[in-house]
């Protein structure tokens, strides 16, 4: 049996969106999924526990088997938990070295210089290689691929000795093949004893990696689902008869009018040409398979730069 890391029994929490009742439990080297009925309320409040924004007001809390109060829990989370969410910190100036050293644990400045030496240690070099992150430390964050950015975030958690890693909805950001590569990096941390919470709305992802799924319904921990129960039982607990909640909504066909924008043979460096129309009364969806197209289109439309040839009409 794995050693317990953190446990909160009958925990009452207060956030800007109201009151919540959560039971939290995870052990060293354990990966637990958290599936919520409403991410904007319960999901945000639960996630904010690990960002220090949701306040523990009542209940019993334990860290490594020791009973602690609200202040002790807040301090433990601040020192031992790190959240990696789907938003990317894309700086044009900061490097990988800055990201690992300067942006983490600023309240432990005395550790900075020993950490600088550890960046080139055999252990750090080996971990980087095993994660597939073979780039110089001087590489700018903005020049990293989406996958490498998240690999670096996982490495940062390991390098700084965080005991609890929280991943928030990365299935909404990464392509499936890249997500599998990232989870290989997460598995390395699990084998080192790091505990991992997965916040996500992709049940297949949860079923694959979670040793348990905590189901949040009605602003409280409603049920704990174990692998032998994985499947339709999840949706039954959430009251989503017939499958996942989004399936209840029917597709609404929109009547598209005349084109308001026509793009022909738009070329960007290292990308195939693009041709598309956006019509009046239409919601256009552009799927970005290489993570760079969306940024380059943004620069093209709003920054008036970035393309090599093509025309608009």
Model regions and ranges:
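Conserved ABC nucleotide-binding domain
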Residues: 127-144
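Conserved ABC transporter NBD signature motif
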Residues: 59-67, 75-78, 310-313
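Helix-to-loop junction immediately C-terminal to a conserved catalytic motif
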Residues: 51, 302
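Glycine-rich P-loop/Walker A and Walker A-like loops and their local beta1-loop-alpha1 context
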Residues: 33-48, 285-299
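H-loop/switch region of ABC-family ATPase nucleotide-binding domains
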Residues: 199-201
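Pre-NBD coupling/linker segments of ABC/ABC-like ATPases
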Residues: 2, 110-121, 224-262
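Q-loop/switch helix immediately C-terminal to the Walker
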Residues: 87, 92-112
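Hydrophobic anchor residue at the start of the ABC signature
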Residues: 153-154
């Amino acid at each position: 049996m794995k050693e317990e890391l953190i446990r909160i029994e009958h925990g009452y929490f207060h956030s800007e969106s109201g009151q919540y009742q959560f039971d939290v439990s995870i052990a060293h080297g354990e990966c637990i999924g958290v599936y919520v009925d409403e991410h904007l309320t319960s999901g945000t409040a639960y996630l904010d526990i690990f960002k220090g924004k949701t306040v523990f007001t009542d209940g019993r809390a334990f860290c490594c088997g020791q009973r602690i109060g609200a202040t002790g829990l807040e301090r433990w989370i601040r020192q031992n938990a790190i959240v990696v969410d789907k938003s990317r910190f894309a700086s044009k100036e900061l490097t990988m070295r800055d990201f690992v050293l300067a942006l983490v644990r600023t309240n432990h400045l005395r550790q900075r210089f020993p950490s600088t030496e550890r960046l080139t240690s055999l252990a750090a070099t080996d971990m980087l290689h095993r994660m597939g992150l073979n780039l110089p430390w001087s590489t700018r964050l903005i020049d990293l691929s989406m996958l490498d950015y998240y690999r670096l975030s996982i490495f940062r958690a390991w390098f700084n000795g965080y005991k609890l890693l929280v991943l928030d909805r990365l299935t909404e950001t990464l392509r499936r093949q890249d997500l599998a590569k990232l989870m290989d990096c997460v598995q390395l941390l699990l084998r080192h004893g790091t505990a991992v919470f997965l916040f996500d709305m992709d049940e297949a992802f949860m079923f694959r990696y979670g040793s348990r799924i905590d189901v949040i319904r009605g602003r409280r921990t409603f049920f704990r689902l174990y692998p032998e129960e994985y499947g339709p039982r999840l949706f039954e607990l959430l009251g989503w008869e017939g499958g996942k909640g989004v399936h209840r909504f029917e597709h609404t066909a929109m009547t598209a009018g005349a084109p308001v924008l026509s793009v022909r043979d738009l070329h960007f460096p290292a990308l195939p040409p693009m041709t598309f129309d956006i019509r009046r009364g239409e919601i256009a969806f552009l799927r970005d398979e290489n993570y760079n197209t969306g940024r380059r289109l943004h620069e093209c439309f709003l920054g008036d730069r970035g393309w090599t040839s093509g025309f608009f009409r």
